Amino acid sequence: MSKDVFILGGKRTPMGEYVGVLKDVSAIDLGAVAARGALEVTSVQADEIDHCVIGNALQTSGDAIYGARHVALKAGVPFDRPALTVNRLCGSGIQSIVSGSQMIQLGEVRTCLVGGMESMSQAPHVIRGARSGFALGQGKLEDSLMVALLDTYCNTPMAGTAENLARKFEVSREEQDKYALRSQQEAKRAKDAGVFAEEIVPVEVKSRKGSVQVSEDDHPRPETTLEGLAKLKPAFAHDGFVTAGNASGIVDGAAALVIAGEDFVKQKDLKPMGRIVSWAYAGVEPEIMGIGPVPATRLALEKAGLSLNDIDLVEVNEAFAAQYLAVEKELGLDRNRTNVNGGAIALGHPLGATGTRLVLTLLHELHRRGGRYGLATACIGGGQGIAMIVERV
């Protein structure tokens, strides 16, 4: 890159179980909590933010069209600073970092508040065509979340794309379940070691009984066993592989980072977490969208002048165990350096927020281990992949 962009730090909310403790907190309010946490942990003042870019895949609340703008305002960013909501589906959280970095490189801004947010619990049920009225017997209630998870271009649900990868790359059900168990086990180890506590900013949830501070992910199932996973029936096809146990969890959550150019970092005498080295996106066949991280990673490595051997840690979003394993096989990933604290199978996958969470988790772990380079990558519904390489500073 022609101009260095640095990640100063960030925070994420806990990942809340579908229709669980965070179900009444909108994506925007989750985003605002993460944004305020990011500002606090970096000691950057809200009035020092020049632009806000937030990723969001499903617009589920009534005020969702205001997206990043409302996140910025609720985080205390002044009225005269603009905001942008971006949607590259599951890559939105990384795309927000890319878009903010591009603004910094172009000299438009010095700082940017970036991140992602998602409330999957608030995805509404809708009746299409109601404005024009219905004939007798018409008017079908539609689950917008389930409908969104079907790629109508190729008439394949997201889980179906994972089934396709399992067959194409000869990934057995047993392999998928073993990997799902590994995700749960590593997430438990990380949680017990206080790893996630460094990332999380609590969310206050109010009710008639008072308020409670939610400070832990509640989707992980540490009691998971291989025997239990093997008993689960395929969720989408009788002869399929994908089950509730080897797919990512539907959850609510948000994550945010503060990024800045070198001039701002030097002027404020700040100590960044990392430097953004490169990024890339790539298209693949929609029917096997989960393989998207492979070409995206190769492009990001090429742009950085690096090889996979130079990468100390990798975070690959675990949309499905079959999808992760296909990517692992194609890239030749070393599992000892990949998803070392578990992933979306255990923690959950809040679509627009996941990418930012991956980068935040990656940077924290690079600092713990003293590694230099890290790669975060995700597949994207519709047939894309996105990847970002960062360097510990």
Q: Can you name each region flagged by the protein language model?
A:
Residues 11-13, 25-33, 41, 175-267, ...:
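N-terminal extracellular/periplasmic Venus flytrap/periplasmic-binding protein-like
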Residues 160-164, 199, 207, 277-346:
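Active-site pocket-lining segment
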